[in-house]
C-alpha cells in the first residue's frame, strides 16, 4: 500500500519529537525505504517482520506507517538481527483508532559493526492501547527513542524495555508520553544489565496537558 503524505500529518504537526533530533531529520532527508500496514476494522492479525541488511557499508533510512483501524488488534514482532557493517535509521509512525490494540515487540540482536537508531511515534484514540516491549541484545550501538500521545479518553500506552550490554558497547534510551485527554494511563519502565565497560542512558518523561487534568 502506498504511503501518502496525510499518513504523517499528525506526526509532522506535533512537537513531541524534538525538532532538533538530527537522526529523525536525516531519516526524512535521505529516506530510501519503508512499509505501510493497515489493520482493517475488527480484524485480529499477527505479523512478524525480519529487518535484514544483506550488504556492508549501507545506511538504511526507513520510515514505516502502521495503522490499526477501529476495533482491530495487531500483534507485531520486529526483528533486527544484522551481522554486517551497516547502519539502520528507522522511524515508525503508529496510529491507533478507537478501541484498537497493538502489541509491539522489538527484538534487537546486531553485531558490533551494525548501528541501529530506532524512533517511534504512536498516537492513541479513545479506548485504544499501545504496548511496546524492547529487547536489546545487540553488540553494536542502539538508540531507542519512543514517543506516545494519548489524544482521546481511556487510551493507554505501556513502553517497556530491557537491555544487556557488554564490552565497550553503548545504548541510549528514551521514552516520552503525552496525556492530552482525561482518564488515560501510561507506564514507562526500562531495565538493563551492563558488564565490562558498557554504558547506557535512560530518560523518561510524562507530560499531562492541562486539558487532561481533572
Annotate the PLM regions:
Residues 3, 13-214:
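Conserved beta-strand/loop scaffold segments within soluble protein domains that form the structured core
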Residues 6:
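Acidic-histidine catalytic/liganding microenvironments
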